[in-house]
C-alpha cells in the first residue's frame, strides 16, 4: 500500500531532474474564467448560486495586509468566531494540520450562515474534507524565519486504495526568536485521517491530531521601561541563570483531538450524520511565585526610576544592566539557599489545566424539494477542566509549605493559613500540586433546525437553535478561610437557556449582482470562570448571573465581473449583559479583591468594502477598507469583594464606561495588495496596510464613582482616570517573491516574505491598569493611575519557504 510513495521519495533524493519550461499561460490563474463555455439551459439556478456564495473579499484582501496589531474584526472578541469541523469545535492550534491533511477552509464573516453551521454574529470558519484524491498527493516543505522560531518542516501524504483513503501529516517548528530575547518555540504536530466509502453511499472517517508544543512567551510592560531600554521589544519575562537565558513564562501543551464521523443515506434525498469527538490533554503556563518577599519582576513600578527617584537606578536602566532590567535568577536562588528551614521564598510553578471535552452530535439532512434543504440536529457537549498549581522548580530550596503566605502577618486571619485543610502544613516538593485544586464542569445541549431555500434568484434561510447549559465548580482543596462546602466539593448549579435565531433573504438581480439581508438574535451563557468570584478556592457564585444577549444585522451587496469583484457590507451589532470576573488589588482599600462586572453593553456598527481587480493579463489588485464605531453604550455595574472574607467593598457601583471605545479594534482600516504573475513561474506581491482610530483597553474599576470621587479630586486627576488613550495609527509595508519550477507533474516552489519593511515601531495593544499610585503630600494623600501596560508589534522580519508537491 505504501510502496509507491517510497519509490517516489527514492527517486527524489537519488538524483535531480531538469527543470521544464512550460508555457507562461500555465502560471496565469484567470484562464479558466475567460474560457468560452456553452451556457447550460437546464437549471438557471447554477448561475445565481455562484454569486450567492461568493468569498469574503474584505477578509481575503486584508487578513495578511493589515498591520500586525490587535485586531478584533467588527469589534467582536476573537472567540466569537466559531471554528467547526462538522459539529466539532476546533481550536486554532489544529488549523495548520487540518489544512495539511487536505481539509478545505471556508470563512463566513459576521452573521452570514455557514454551509453546515447556523453561526452567531462573529463569523464562522468551516473545515470540510472533500471527496476524491488530490492531483498532487504528497508535500514536503521547509521554512526559515527570525520570528518565534528559526526553522520548520512539514510533510503530508494522501493515499487511496479502493474505498479506503488515508492522509498523514506532520508539522514541526523549533528555535528561538532572533528579534525578542526569551521567545522560542519547540512544537510538533502530527495528524492522521482514515476514511472509507461504502457501496450503499455511506461514508465513515476517523481523524486524530496530536499537537505538542513548548513556547517561551513575552510580556507587556510600561512605556517607561521601553523608553529606558530604548527597545520596543523589551521582554521582562526572562533573565540570566548561570550565564544562560531563562524565561519564566513558558507555555507547554499536549492536547490531542479525535473525531469520528459517519454519514448514512436513508433515502435518495435524506442523510443521517453522526459525530463523536474527544479533546483531552494538559496545558501548562509557568510563572514565578514569591512569598513574603519583594516581587522578582524587574519592571514593577517600585523598581523604576520614576518611583525610586535615585540616579543609580536610572543609570542602571539606561546602561541596560540585566541585574535591574531582567529577572536575576541567581539572586533568587541565593535568597532561597539562605533560608534557615529550607522553605522557599521564590519558586517557579505551573498553572495547569487538565482538559477533557466530549461532543456527540447527530444531524438529519433532507431535500423534500430540489430547491429546499432542511437540517435537524442535536449536539451534546460535556466539558471538564481541572485547574491546579504544580511545583516546577524550587530554585535551590528544599520544599515549600502549602499555606497562604499572604496571611502570615494578618492580625485577623493569620491563624487561618491552610490552603488544604485536610492536609495541613504539607511540604511541597518538585512536581507536587499545591495552592489550589478545582474543576469546572459544563454541560451543553443544543437542538437546531434550519431551512435553506434556493430558487433562480431567491436565496432564503431561516434557522433556530435552542439550548440548555449547566455550570458548576467542584473544589478538591478545603481552604481554611472558606471551610466546608464554601470551598470543598460541588458548588450550586447554574442553569442557562441560550438561543440563536437567524434569518437571511437574498436576491440575485443578475448572475453578477446580489443583495442580501441577514438578521440575528441570540444569547450565550457566560464563560464558566466568569460565574465565580474566586474560582481558585471559593464556591461563591456571582449575584444574578445572566446570559449575554446579541442582536445583529448586516446588508451585503456583491457585484462580480470578468475583471472586477466588489463586495460592500453594512453591519450593526448590539451586545448586552456582558460579564467578567477577575482578581485585583484595590489601592483605596489596600486589599486583594475579587472583581465582578455585569451589564456590559457595546454598540458595534460600520461598513466594510472589499474589491478584487484584474488590471491586465498579469497584474491583479486587491483592496479593502472599513470604517466603524465600536463603543460602550451602557455603564456596567461593579461589585468588589475582599478576597479574604468576602466582605463587600463595592456593591453594583456604576462604572462610567459609556462612550469609551472598544480596545484592540481599529475603527478605520485600509489595505492594498498588488500582485504580479510573471513568466516562468515568477510572482511577486506588494502590500500596504493602515489601521487607525485605535484605543487602549479601558479599565472598568478606575471609572467607578468611588474611585473618581476619592482619587479624581482635581480636573487633571479626574481626566487622567477617565480619559481613554488613543493609540497612534499603524502602517505596514510588506513584500513577497515566489518562483515555481515544474518537473513533469511535480512542482517546487520557493518563496521569500518580508514583513514591516519600513521597520516602524508600532504599538500592538495597550491595557489600562486598575492600580492607583498613592502619593503622600503632607497630611493629604493623592492618587494617580498607574502607567498602562503595552506591547509592540514585531519589527522587520523575514520568512523563507521551500515546498515540493508531487
List the predicted regions and their residue ranges:
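Signature of Gram-negative outer-membrane beta-barrel scaffolds
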Residues: 347, 373-510, 535
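Surface-exposed extracellular loop regions of Gram-negative outer-membrane beta-barrel proteins
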Residues: 221, 418-427, 470-483, 493, ...
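A beta-strand signature from Gram-negative outer-membrane beta-barrel systems
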Residues: 54, 96-141, 152
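Outer-membrane beta-barrel signature, preferentially recognizing the C-terminal barrel domain
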Residues: 236-257, 261, 440-443, 490-504, ...
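Gram-negative outer-membrane beta-barrel transporters
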Residues: 454, 570-574, 593-702, 801-805
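C-terminal beta-signal and adjacent terminal beta-strands/loops
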Residues: 20-22, 621, 690-708, 739-806
